């Protein structure tokens, strides 16, 4: 009986750990989706900007500066305080590559989440069965 109780505790702890891992993965997927959305918005913005055109540059919540685009180049951060100048087309290609990488990461995360959800369901069923057996054994003793 004591082995059964210990087994139940271990499985309950494993179930809790699996649930925490699933929440972490779901949080990562949410972050990936938000980043993808931000990158897609950047791509649309860059595609619509033309040289010699006036635009608004966001500098804070609800604060914009009027600016004139002088050419079709952008500065891209590659490391801390290191920037590389690239054409809008190159930037768009780099951003599209980032979206592809994020798509792969999202799919991997979804696959892991699905596997973990199946493991959680199986462990939960197993735990419920063992709890019922323990209750039946307890009832027989009484």
UniProtKB/Swiss-Prot annotation:
Instruction: List all membrane-crossing ranges.
Output: none
Alphabetically list the UniProt keywords.
Chaperone, Cytoplasm
Q: Which GO terms describe its cellular component?
A: cytoplasm; prefoldin complex
In terms of domain of life, where is this protein from? Archaea
Its primary localisation, in coarse terms, equals cytoplasm
> What CDD domains does the annotation carry?
Prefoldin_alpha_GimC
GO biological processes: protein folding
Molecular function terms, GO-annotated? unfolded protein binding
Protein's cellular compartments: Cytoplasm
Q: Any idea what job this protein has? A: Molecular chaperone capable of stabilizing a range of proteins. Seems to fulfill an ATP-independent, HSP70-like function in archaeal de novo protein folding.
Similarity field: Belongs to the prefoldin subunit alpha family.
Q: What is this protein called?
A: Prefoldin subunit alpha 1
């Amino acid at each position: 009986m004591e082995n059964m109780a210990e087994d139940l505790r271990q499985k309950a702890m494993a179930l809790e750990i699996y649930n925490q891992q699933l929440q972490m993965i779901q949080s990562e997927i949410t972050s990936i989706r938000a980043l993808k959305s931000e990158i897609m918005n950047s791509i649309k913005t860059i595609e619509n900007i033309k040289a010699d055109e006036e635009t608004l540059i966001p500098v804070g919540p609800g604060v914009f500066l009027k600016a004139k685009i002088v050419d079709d180049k952008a500065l891209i951060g590659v490391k801390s305080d290191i920037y590389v100048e690239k054409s809008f087309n190159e930037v768009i290609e780099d951003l599209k590559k980032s979206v592809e990488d994020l798509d792969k990461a999202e799919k991997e995360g979804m696959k892991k989440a699905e596997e973990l959800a199946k493991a959680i369901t199986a462990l939960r069923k197993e735990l419920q069965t063992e709890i019922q057996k323990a209750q039946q054994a307890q009832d027989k003793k009484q």
